[in-house]
């Protein structure tokens, strides 16, 4: 079977599975050649995906046409960086200045840019307060090279959630007062996100039919909305 098993899941995945579980749900359910994180009493399949979406490809290909599915993808809206020693004792703690929102989803959605057009799929983005637990400093690989410890994500609190249930919900992410046509940079400023993320948002929105090309201003491509929220 393929899928994330209980023995392999990280603390963030486990905590979110508990958070989303409802009375009557079944957890870690064998489903054909896959394992599903949660199967709702009404038949909806819930997959909690803390990393990239590419590993979900075979599961989506096999199941999405015949089952309602919900992908839960957490975003660390607020985070603390905790440094611990080999015994797990806390050495230091600091709050990260980085703040993130639901748009971070599009860093992952570029793997399947038109995914949200499928009528059986919803993506839910819990905006979380997290602790990122890391080693005291850089670690070394077997070859002796210094490597950055990716750490371990732990859930402290779910602050809010954003649900995208189709292209119309994606269109609603574009600020209503943004003048058209607009460049990717202008949309990034309006959304308050970095230019690379704005480019990925544009890529996915074009694939979903939410944006259309509208020529260029100098060398910068222009876009217009194709639907309103």
Regions found by a protein language model. Give the residues of each.
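Short, cationic-aromatic polyanion-contact patches
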Residues: 216-229
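Long, low-complexity, charged/polar intrinsically disordered regions in eukaryotic proteins
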Residues: 93-165
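Acidic-basic catalytic patches of nuclease active cores, encompassing PD-(D/E)XK
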Residues: 1-35
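Conserved catalytic cores of phosphodiester-cleaving nucleases, focusing on short active-site segments
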Residues: 36-52, 56, 63, 69-71
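Short amphipathic alpha-helical interaction segments
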Residues: 192-207
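Short acidic, hydrophobic short linear motifs in intrinsically disordered regions
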Residues: 178-191
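A short, conserved structural fragment
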Residues: 206-217
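A basic- and aromatic-enriched beta-loop-alpha substructure that forms the phosphate/nucleotide-
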Residues: 59-121
